[in-house]
Structure formats: C-alpha cells, structure tokens
C-alpha cells in the first residue's frame, strides 16, 4: 500500500512541499545563530556527499559535455539558496515562501527572452496580477528594512526561474542526479567567499544537528520532487506544490507566532491564483 501511495505524483509533490517546509523551519531556527551563507554551505556540502553516493549506487557518471550549462544551473541554484535562506532569516516564513513561489512568472519571461518562446496575449494580464501581488507583499511605498529583505526573497524567485530554464535545457541529456550534483557542488563553492568574513564555528551539538538535518531533509525533499515529476505531469506537480505556502505559514505561526497581515494574504492569493493559471496556460 505504501509503495502504491509513493507512485502517486500528487502525493509525492505534497510530501516534497512538506519536507521542504520542514527544511525552511530548520533554516530559520539555525539562522538565529548562524549566517545564511554558512547554512547554504553546510546544506550544499552535505547534499553533495549524499547525492554523490546515490550516483555511485545508480552507476551515474559525470558527463564531459554540457558542463557550461550545468555550471550555469549550479550558479543560479546557489544564488537562489543564498537569497531564499537570507529572506527566511529576516522575514516571516509565509512571506518568503510566497515570494519564492513567484518563479513561474520569471520562467515565462526568461523563456521568452532566452528561448524565443511566444507569450500568449492572455498571459500578459496574469503577469500583471503577479506583479500586483508582489507589490502588496514587498510594500515598496512604505519603505522599511522589511522591504529590502522582501526584495531579496523576490530575487530568490528570479534565480530559481533561471535554474528551471537551465534544467529544461539539461534534462534531455543529463541524469537528474548529475544535475543535482552540479547544483549542490557549485552552491558549496559559491557559499565559501560569501560566508568567509562572517563565518561562525558551530559551537553546540544543537547547531551541528540543525545543519545535518537541513542537508538530509533537503535531499529527501529533492528525491520526493524528482519522483513526483516522473509519475505526474509537470503542471499538476507545480500547482500542487503551492500547498507548501500553507505548511510554511503553519510553522511560522506555531514556532515564531508569525501572522501574515491583510496585504500579504491578499498579495499571496493573487500570486498563487495567477501562477496556477500561468502553469495551466503554459501547458495549453
């Protein structure tokens, strides 16, 4: 019965979203004493080791072709992690999650700019709705430090979209494990100079435990997500993943008493509805 359930793409997408929300909560807790770039380093280094072991077990070798695009995907993914973890450390989990889930908006823009894909006229209105929702969350007209952190969260969606476009170019020729390996290995290297001046030696078993848990849980989420895409259409998986916003909001309320304000809730609804519509439009 369990094996049958794990063949459900929708259930796997929900499990992936839940697992990543747990990772986000662990990141927020760790960020109380450790810099975001350092958390990215340990998350990526642990993940690199684990995915390498999976590659060995599956007999997946590193390619000699397509390396530049693999590196581009790695850099985009690394910058996504840095921005996302930084946002998680400074703004409510729900807010950071909503902003990161704007990546379909940027995927469409990048696909038009770099892949020459045509944007249907109806999509322009949906893009405007996404922008309006983002403005309601970032609140640029009531400038504060929150707005700066929210912009960083928005950048995480930009870099996630860049990584997604690169994956579309890579997935036909490269094994998923290899793509993930390059992502994590490059993220490890990118994090080193970013954390160099602010590095804090983890001083307690609790801090080491959090870092280890982040690395393991994040890779588990990646496995669930990869399997979800193999059992269900990309559109359905992408739409299902928006439940992650609910999970993140739940952790934020439960552990940090975070309650989104009315503008954030309204903006989040606009973004989710518009991005789901964008996903369905793109499929058609």
Curated annotation (Swiss-Prot):
The record's induction entry says: Is part of the operon cntOLMI that is negatively regulated by zinc level through the Zur repressor, which leads to transcriptional activation of this operon under zinc depletion.
Q: Which InterPro entries match?
A: EamA_dom
Q: Which SUPFAM superfamilies match?
A: Multidrug resistance efflux transporter EmrE
Q: Phenotype when inactivated?
A: Mutant shows a large decrease in the extracellular pseudopaline level, with a concomitant increase in the intracellular space. Mutant is unable to grow in airway mucus secretions (AMS) and is impaired in iron accumulation in this media supplemented with iron.
Pfam families, sorted: EamA (PF00892)
Protein name in UniProt: Pseudopaline exporter CntI
User: Is the Cell membrane keyword given for this protein?
Assistant: yes
Q: Which GO terms describe its cellular component?
A: plasma membrane
- Entry keywords, A to Z: Cell inner membrane, Cell membrane, Membrane, Repeat, Transmembrane, Transmembrane helix, Transport
